[in-house]
Amino acid sequence: MKILHICSEMYPLIKTGGLADVMGALPYAQQSAGNDVRVLIPYYPQVASKLGETVEVATVGTFAGVVTVRFAYLNGLGVYVIDAPHLFDRRLPYYDDNYQDYTDNYKRFALLGYLGAQLASGLDHWWGRSDVLHAHDWQAGLACAYLKSWNSPVKSVFTIHNIAYPGRFQAYHLAELALPWEFFHVNGLEFYGEISYLKAGLFYADRVTAVSPTYAREITEQIAGAGMHGLLQQRLAEGALRGILNGVDDTVWNPETDTNIVANYRPNYMQGKGKNKSELQRYFGLPEDKDALLFVMVTRLTEQKGADFLLARIDQIMQHNVQLVVLGSGSPDLEWALRDAQSRYPHKIGLKIGYDEALSHQIIAGGDVILVPSRFEPCGLTQLYGLKYGTLPLVRRTGGLADTVNDAHKESIENRTATGFVFSYPDADNFYDAVLRAINLWGKNKLWSSVRQNALAQDFGWAKVAQQYQELYYEIV
């Protein structure tokens, strides 16, 4: 089967979040299963520097100017890029240094969808037409609308990685995007008087997926549906919406082979984990105390991610024999609050504002508990990395976190299903209760080791995920 993925980022070419990790793994898993898979992304400077030599596929005149589609192989996978310097030659992919969205994002990502639909329809004569176009998040959503507007035989799948980002733009931009005006309708692109690229994917795709079963249910409800819940209820009733959990790329995230950590380890040989903890403590200037419970957090600092729960209880938490390491960036208020906490507890808190892929591996390998207290979380990947590395996740019961982490309590520990710590209500008190339960279990070495072994035994490989998407594709092809 020929599959074309359309996305705005892909690891290791460019990454701002979990979408990139998915796009750096799912296409390879599908290719390994015997499919002919390719990916289309913009030709950002970071992509140009890492992709190497490319060949020209086509130069076309579009509503966004004359642009060139180029092609190269990335570790054996075919990747198309949109070479349009006037749109994509920028340091950051979505916003400027002041976190202000680029004013021409409507055009930049309409072009991504347009050329995705063109490629799926046979723009590359050497590759021909794809069986399935698979678009990811709002940046690629218009691809599904373009296919429908052309009455294309190509089938489309749209995956919601985060419904909180609807890709909303002023309605008058539709005149520039080579789409018919009749698409500006409640049964179409229209969303509260504007156009929504996310809604384009939800409405026009032949199938819609969310990145976990629980999230697929949550987004059909008003509280989590971001205004799209009515449409999603309709797609669910049609049998067109389902949840497919993300996986973990074993070639990137594997404590047995990870080159970004100081000591490799495996479930039956865990000495290396202690060495990684010591290295992490040294890196952040913390006392090398193997008995201190080391909490870690690798996150975007946004309201969604729940760092404010941690900050609200930081003084109480620091009264225990614990340490904390945080890697992340985002809200200036949250960054300031973390810096303030670190200045007050310099021997207990390590902080790095920013993102560092290699360091994130060392943090997850060296931690004892990874904090993912999100208010909502479509799938979440860091808790999966935590499980893989024996770093017990502490999560809120929402989205993919609910699907992947089992709370440690007396019964679940006894029947060997416990893999972490789960709290339900999104507030600082419930978060702190979960922290106290983690501290309590840490003091019981045999029970902690048992839960950690359960975590290490979890299987979230991409082969299973690829098979689920394959079955979905066969429903429509």
Curated annotation (Swiss-Prot):
UniProt pathway annotation: Glycan biosynthesis; glycogen biosynthesis
Q: Which GO terms describe its biological process?
A: glycogen biosynthetic process
Stored SUPFAM superfamilies: UDP-Glycosyltransferase/glycogen phosphorylase
The UniProt record lists the EC number as: 2.4.1.21
Gene3D superfamilies, alphabetically?
Glycogen Phosphorylase B (3.40.50.2000)
According to its UniProt record, which reaction does this protein catalyse? Answer: [(1->4)-alpha-D-glucosyl](n) + ADP-alpha-D-glucose = [(1->4)-alpha-D-glucosyl](n+1) + ADP + H(+)
Q: Cite a single GO MF annotation.
A: alpha-1,4-glucan glucosyltransferase (ADP-glucose donor) activity
An example GO CC term for this entry is: cytosol
What top-tier enzyme class does this entry carry?
transferase
The entry's ADP-alpha-D-glucose-binding residues are: 15
**Keywords associated with the record:** Glycogen biosynthesis, Glycosyltransferase, Transferase
Q: Pfam families, from UniProt?
A: Glyco_transf_5, Glycos_transf_1
Function description: Synthesizes alpha-1,4-glucan chains using ADP-glucose.
Q: Which family does it belong to?
A: Belongs to the glycosyltransferase 1 family. Bacterial/plant glycogen synthase subfamily.
This protein is called what? Answer: Glycogen synthase
